């Protein structure tokens, strides 16, 4: 993404410093603002949940934000195809079924080689991506995606390539929800509900990012921990020897039982339930949990994973874990879950204030 990425990084650094400054000021002032912290391992869907909150409670996206996301959508679309093509060559050793499409492969790969994947898709590039996406060899490589690192949004953007490449394209809310750029530092959304001011923070999910920020949030009202239950057969982007589900459970364990968060409510979003529902029919969760003896179906497998997370809570008498199965890209479903979460928080605040 070239200069687009570097500009985002510099702007992000300035924003991170401002947020940290405000957090420290809030702490000194003993602020009554309701602070929620989104945590989870990389690519679990935290940023998507935060964007949903922005759509539902914070007047959506500004024109400037929409323009920024346009470049990210272009990038995600080109990168998705390039990632599949590279995996076909280097990991899967799969050829294109139609050898005549090698020229189209070269067209798409050249966009990334030139650092132009954040630019508007030309008609030539769009046609090449759509043609490659229809190739049975590419489809087979997509089905084998757990063997390499491919974002969950790849299918969405490749399916929508023609629309995305149209002149005057403007990302809609769904495009923005699916768009993906790794969170570095802290991203914040503010909104007001029933006279309460909410501040929600998304902390970068990769290991290095988490270490930088966790100490800043010892006074948050609740932690929304997000785990991608569909990733039980995948490894980390930053460590390809570690199973993503196991990493998520280890992180949950450290947060749930941390001295920083002894009195903080824990809300667990078991995210990507739609992908889990599809995958469980093909891949058993014994991949991550050899002790699982239940059926290869959604209900039994999810119940088992819930129990695994519940067992990590070392203080169940004092700390309740509220669990929700979610699909972060489904606005209607997320709205119901977030409303339930916010109602719970409001009730707790009223109890603290002695009004219940």
From Swiss-Prot:
Ligand binding (GTP): 40-47, 177-183, 202-206, 271-274, 328
Presence of keyword Cell wall biogenesis/degradation: no
One Pfam family in the UniProt entry: G-alpha
GO molecular function: G protein-coupled receptor binding; G-protein beta/gamma-subunit complex binding; GTP binding; GTPase activity; metal ion binding; olfactory receptor binding
InterPro entries: Gprotein_alpha_I (IPR001408), Gprotein_alpha_su (IPR001019), GproteinA_insert (IPR011025), P-loop_NTPase (IPR027417)
Region of interest called G5 motif, as start-end residue ranges on this chain: 326-331
Disulfide bond annotation, renumbered to this chain: none
Region (G4 motif): 267-274
Subcellular location: Cell projection, Cilium; Cell projection, Dendrite
Sequence segments annotated as region (G1 motif): 35-48
GO biological process: adenylate cyclase-modulating G protein-coupled receptor signaling pathway; chemotaxis; cilium assembly; hyperosmotic response; olfactory behavior; response to odorant; sensory perception of smell
Positions of the G-alpha domain: 32-356
GO cellular component, one term: dendrite
Keyword NAD (UniProt): no
SUPFAM superfamilies: P-loop containing nucleoside triphosphate hydrolases, Transducin (alpha subunit), insertion domain
Annotated segments matching region G2 motif: 175-183
Function: Guanine nucleotide-binding proteins (G proteins) are involved as modulators or transducers in various transmembrane signaling systems. This specific G-alpha subunit plays an important role in olfaction and in cilia morphogenesis. Involved in chemotactic responses to attractants diacetyl, pyrazine, 2,4,5-trimethylthiazole, benzaldehyde, isoamyl alcohol, butanone and 2,3-pentanedione. Displays a redundant function with gpa-3 in chemotactic responses. Involved in avoidance responses to copper, sodium dodecyl sulfate and linoleic acid. Involved in osmotic avoidance and mechanosensory responses.
Subunit and interaction comment: G proteins are composed of 3 units; alpha, beta and gamma. The alpha chain contains the guanine nucleotide binding site.
Family in the record: Belongs to the G-alpha family.
Listed name of the protein: Guanine nucleotide-binding protein alpha-17 subunit
Organism: Caenorhabditis briggsae
